Every structure is written in C-alpha cells, then in structure tokens.
C-alpha cells in the first residue's frame, strides 16, 4: 500500500481543493481540450504534491523519530542493516526512523531512490528475531530500489487526470441540461451550483473507485518487494517474517501508510481495495519462486 492510503487521501484532497478553487473563481475550461489540459495539470499536480510531501507526512502521522546518532545497540544494528542492504541494492543510504507502535510494521517512502526514508515500529524491533527484522527491512529497501513510489505517482497522476476530466465533463453536461443551456462548445455556463455539486461528488466517488487500479498496482509490487527481500537476505528469512506477521494483530497505522507498510492484513474491505495480497498468497509466491525468476 483497502482502507484508503494516506497517499490516495492526499491526492483526493488536492483534487477536491483544486476543484473548489476553480468552481468558486469561475475558472472553468470552455472546451474539451482545455478541460483535458486542466485535468492533466491538476491530476499530476496532486500526485506529485503527495510524493514531495511523503516523508514529512509519514513521519508526522506516526510520530516517527529519525535516528541521527544511534543511542543504543538496537539503533546501531538498525542503521548498519539499512546501510548494508542499501549498498547491496545500489541505492543511497535512506534516512532511518523508529516510531512507537506495539504492532509489527515498517514502511518506506520518499520522492527519489536516493532520498528515501525507512521507518520501523518499536513493536517490530521488540517482537521479531534479527533474521525476521532483516527480511522486513530488505522488503522496504526493495520498494525503494524498485522505484515504487515514483511509479505509483505516475499511475496516480493518470488516474487523477481521468477522474477530474470525466467528473467535470459530466458536471458541465448536467449544469447545462438543468439550466436549458445548449452551448455547443460544452461550456459550463449553466447553473454554477449544480456544476460545483456534481463535480465534487463525482470526483469523490470516481476517486474512490479509481483506487482499485492503484491498489492492484500496490499488490503487484508487494510480490516484487518480497522477492527483492529474498534476494537480499534469503527466501527462508522472508517467509519466516511473513509467517510471524500472520500471528500479529491488525496494524494501527489507521489507513495512512498501508500502501507501503509490510503488514497487509485487512478485514474491512474486499481484496479489490487491499493494498497488500493476503499473507498466505505472498508466502506461496515465495515458495514457488514465481517472482524470483
């Protein structure tokens, strides 16, 4: 990472704010071509705003503390492990953070492969063996090395563009129809309140439905991150880490970082909206070597 992830929520919020500003100021495109250009600018804008703010938002949301100087043996081990694995993966040393949480979890984020952040919960450090913790860290390092955040941003930008475009196109038609406006250029000169209400509702609804696409991508990348971890530290360590996760309870990152957290349990949504495949499927994929080929 279905519980809408922080990345998706931020995109949705940016899209709605842009839509509100456009509607209130009357800055509305007068043609389909203009609408598409506007949708593209704002659609990708929302995605890249989320990407650029990702480290700050992630640390703020969990109360994470970046390790500047290790204060104990555990922090030294954590820094050494991240440094070693990042060198193996061919990326720059990420920032490393710890956050207070009883559950076993970790996440990676950042705008670039060489400017990333890896954070782990205190629950992970306390309840996992060193081998299992190494596998989880390698999973997050693999997310960074694979460029998953940037790829997610590009996919989200495309999805945002179509959500904004289709929502506002329908809103223009609805506003014109209800006001009796038959502007051949598709102008939104109809009822402005109808245009505003319809476009806001549709952007919200289509944005949630479009998360099916981004969640499919997230699930796909989880298999590859698991495989990346297996290459860095060994298949059995990653399998052991996933098996340990099966015994842990539901993570408490409250829907905010699930798209890139290691723990992907979900009971509230169907698999279409899950950011992670079920743990059993991930274990089976590792055992079969499907993503290691």
UniProtKB/Swiss-Prot annotation:
Keywords of the record: Cell inner membrane, Cell membrane, Hydrolase, Membrane, Metal-binding, Metalloprotease, Protease, Stress response, Transmembrane, Transmembrane helix, Zinc
Binding positions for Zn(2+) per the UniProt entry: 139, 143, 222
InterPro entries, per the entry: HtpX_protease (IPR050083), Pept_M48_protease_HtpX (IPR022919), Peptidase_M48 (IPR001915)
GO biological process: proteolysis
Top-rank taxon, per record: Bacteria
Entry EC number(s): 3.4.24.-
Cellular component terms (Gene Ontology): plasma membrane
Residues annotated as catalytic: 140
Record's subcellular location: Cell inner membrane
Segments crossing the lipid bilayer: 4-24, 34-54, 158-178, 193-213
Cofactor binding note from Swiss-Prot or TrEMBL: Binds 1 zinc ion per subunit.
Family the UniProt entry places it in: Belongs to the peptidase M48B family.
Classification via HAMAP family: Pept_M48_protease_HtpX
Protein name: Protease HtpX
Gene this chain is encoded by: htpX
């Amino acid at each position: 990472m279905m519980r809408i992830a922080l990345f998706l929520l931020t995109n949705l919020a940016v899209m709605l704010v842009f839509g509100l500003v456009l509607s209130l100021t009357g800055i509305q495109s007068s043609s389909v071509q203009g609408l598409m250009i506007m949708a593209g600018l704002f659609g990708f804008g929302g995605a890249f705003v989320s990407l650029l703010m990702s480290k700050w938002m992630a640390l703020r949301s969990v109360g994470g503390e970046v390790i500047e100087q290790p204060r104990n043996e555990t922090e030294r081990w954590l820094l050494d492990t991240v440094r070693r694995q990042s060198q193996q993966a061919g990326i720059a040393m990420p920032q490393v953070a710890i956050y207070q949480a009883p559950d076993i979890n970790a996440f990676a984020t950042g705008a670039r492969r060489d400017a990333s952040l890896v954070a782990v919960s205190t629950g992970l450090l306390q309840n996992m063996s060193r081998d299992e913790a190494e596998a989880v860290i390698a999973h997050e390092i693999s997310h960074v090395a694979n460029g998953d955040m940037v790829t997610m941003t590009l996919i989200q930008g495309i999805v945002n563009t179509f959500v904004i475009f289709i929502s506002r196109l329908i809103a223009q038609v609805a506003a014109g129809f209800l006001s009796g406006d038959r502007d051949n250029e598709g102008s939104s000169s109809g009822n402005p309140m109808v245009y505003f209400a319809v476009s806001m509702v549709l952007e919200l609804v289509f944005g949630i439905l479009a998360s099916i696409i981004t969640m499919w991508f997230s699930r796909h990348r989880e298999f590859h991150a698991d495989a990346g971890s297996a290459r860095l530290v060994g298949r059995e360590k990653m399998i052991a880490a996933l098996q340990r996760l099966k015994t842990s309870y539901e993570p408490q990152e409250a829907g905010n970082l699930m798209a890139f957290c290691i723990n992907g349990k979900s009971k509230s949504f169907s698999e279409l909206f899950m950011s992670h495949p079920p743990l059993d499927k991930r274990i089976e994929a590792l055992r079969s070597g499907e993503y290691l080929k």
